[in-house]
């Protein structure tokens, strides 16, 4: 039954994978690392860092869990291939920036079971699937940031940061990828395209959307393709 499958996955995560991490690294703060896993599972695709997580433990749970310990525990989880870390990359400045990273789960089934199959946000889950597939194909994957100047409601010039879901590199190849579950509204299209419009180079820019749509290019030269097509075609980025 579905319940048995879910219980099996939860048991595997807690009593095999997580227990192995705890025993191999002689972790004393067992409750804390369990909650840390839940925090990371709840925040796939959301930039965060050990300091933010420590503040969450202090304010919401009244638990002392230091930045250094959290950082070590995240490294242990990554070494066990439970999670992967994606660094933030300043596309215009051509440099890595800040302490914030995005964390993705290697096995979404285990992640979903850990959360009792709550928090099934389609966009973040799609993003995690695309990230995993890019790693499987041998690409180096970062999270992109593009700085732009815009005007606020009062007409003042303000600096804004736009995000590109993935900056994907392999040798001299590079792709910029946005992942969007829903592109039906003009507002959503503007949000997804605006980051790509402000990248000052000619590498391929791709938007992966829900569904099985074959690749096509819009008027701006961006490639748009369905998730199913992306996953089932190993050379899908070459369109």
Label the predicted regions.
Residues 1-47:
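Interdomain motor-coupling "hinge/lid" segment immediately C-terminal to the ATP-binding subdomain
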Residues 4, 28-31, 65, 125-126, ...:
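A generic structural signal for residues located within well-ordered alpha-helices
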Residues 6-11, 30-37, 51, 68-71, ...:
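Non-catalytic, well-ordered alpha-helical scaffold segments
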Residues 16, 20, 40, 61, ...:
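Conserved NTP-handling cores and scaffolds of large molecular machines
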Residues 38-42, 58, 135:
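Short, locally clustered residues in the helix-turn-helix/winged-helix DNA-binding domain
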Residues 50-62:
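DNA-recognition alpha helix
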Residues 69-239:
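A cross-kingdom feature that marks ATP-driven nucleic-acid transaction machinery
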């Amino acid at each position: 039954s579905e319940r048995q499958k879910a219980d099996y996955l939860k048991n595997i995560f807690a009593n095999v994978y997580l227990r192995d991490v705890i025993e191999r690294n002689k972790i004393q703060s067992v409750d804390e690392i369990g909650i840390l896993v839940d925090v990371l599972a709840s925040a796939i695709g959301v930039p965060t860092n050990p300091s933010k997580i420590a503040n969450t433990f202090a304010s919401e749970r009244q638990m002392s869990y230091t930045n250094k310990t959290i950082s070590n525990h995240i490294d242990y989880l990554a070494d066990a291939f439970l999670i992967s870390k994606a660094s933030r990359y300043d596309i215009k400045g051509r440099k890595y920036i800040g302490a914030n990273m995005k964390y993705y789960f290697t096995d979404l089934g285990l992640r979903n079971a850990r959360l009792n199959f709550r928090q099934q946000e389609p966009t973040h889950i799609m993003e995690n699937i695309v990230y995993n597939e890019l790693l499987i194909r041998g690409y180096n994957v970062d999270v992109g940031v593009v700085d732009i100047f815009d005007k606020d409601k009062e007409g003042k010039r303000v600096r804004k940061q736009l995000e590109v879901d993935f900056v994907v590199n392999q040798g001299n190849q590079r792709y910029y990828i946005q992942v969007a579950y829903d592109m039906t509204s003009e507002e959503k299209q503007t949000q997804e395209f605006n980051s790509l419009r402000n990248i000052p180079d000619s590498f391929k820019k791709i938007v992966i959307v829900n569904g099985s749509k074959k690749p096509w290019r819009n008027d701006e030269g961006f490639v748009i393709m369905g998730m199913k097509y992306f996953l089932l075609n190993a050379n899908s980025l070459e369109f």
